[in-house]
Amino acid sequence: MRVVGFHLMPWTEVEHAVAWPFSDDEFDPEIGHELYEDYLGQLELCEDVGFDMVGVNEHHYSSYGLMPSPNLMASRLIDRTDDITIGIMGNILPLRGHPVRVAEELSMLDTMSDGRICSGFVRG
């Protein structure tokens, strides 16, 4: 059995459930910075406790997911971890432009991580 750690990275500063799209008027960059560091630390901890993979995904204009770019999150995790597989659970291909660009980015990430990238795709 393999164990994957995953975190949606929600925006915690909402008082009630909100509909999509979530307005960026309520986004505070200082709180955002703190949340990203905290959430990345939680994902980094997955390696320390023995998980096989850590997963990141893509959500836009949503209070329940602060990850519009899973490739950027994977890049940060490459630098913060040593051996754990980094699962990119979905680049939304229609939003990414040309598929060659996505393939090249994933190839770069896999090379920089010494083969630790596992990637999937979603339709949107």
Give the residues covered by each predicted segment.
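Glycine-rich "substrate-gating" loop/helix at the edge of Rossmann-like oxidoreductase active sites
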Residues: S63-L66, N91-G97
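Glycine-rich anion/phosphate-binding loops
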Residues: H33-D38, P94-M108
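Conserved beta-strand positions in the central sheet of alpha/beta enzyme cores
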Residues: G55, C118-G120
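Active-site beta-loop-alpha junctions enriched in small/polar residues
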Residues: L8-P10, H59, N91-L93, V122-G124
